[in-house]
Design a protein with these regions (language model features):
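Short hydrophobic/aromatic patches on the structural cores and recognition surfaces of FHA
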Residues: 17, 33, 56
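Double-stranded beta-helix
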Residues: 47-100
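Short, conserved beta-strand element in jelly-roll/cupin
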Residues: 5-21, 59-61
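Structural motif
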Residues: 11, 18-20, 27, 43, ...
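Short beta-strand His + acidic residue motifs that chelate non-heme Fe in jelly-roll/DSBH
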Residues: 1-2, 21-22, 38, 44-50
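Short, surface-exposed secondary-structure boundary micro-motifs
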Residues: 41-42, 61
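Short acidic-glycine-tyrosine-enriched beta hairpin
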Residues: 25-40
Length: 100
């Protein structure tokens, strides 16, 4: 999922796999059973860095329309770090490549 933010707060819960979560200027590896809280307005990106699918649940609050949902449903959401548009103002480029 490429860099994005929204007005709602959200929580990601990793069900399976390994990902790299970039949250503002923070970068961390997340694995099965972990959760990440994302405050409103904070730019973030999640990238699958494992060899298996990354499955997660996420929830937003309060309810509302989130722009990247429409992109996901239409199949136009760019992959993180691949064919990505320019970073939005405030986003950090530290998660554009897989860690070595």
């Amino acid at each position: 999922m490429p860099w994005h933010n929204q007005e709602q707060e959200e929580i990601y819960f990793v069900i399976e796999g390994t990902g790299e979560m970039c949250l503002g200027q923070e970068r961390q590896t997340v694995t099965s059973g972990q959760a990440v809280y994302i405050p409103p307005g904070v730019f973030h990106q999640l990238t699958n860095i494992g060899d298996t699918p990354l499955r997660m649940l996420y929830c937003y609050g309060p309810a509302g329309d989130v722009a990247h949902w429409r992109q996901e449903l239409s199949g136009t959401l760019p992959k993180a770090g691949v064919d990505a548009p320019p970073l939005p103002a405030g986003a950090q480029p530290q998660c554009m490549e897989k860690p070595v």
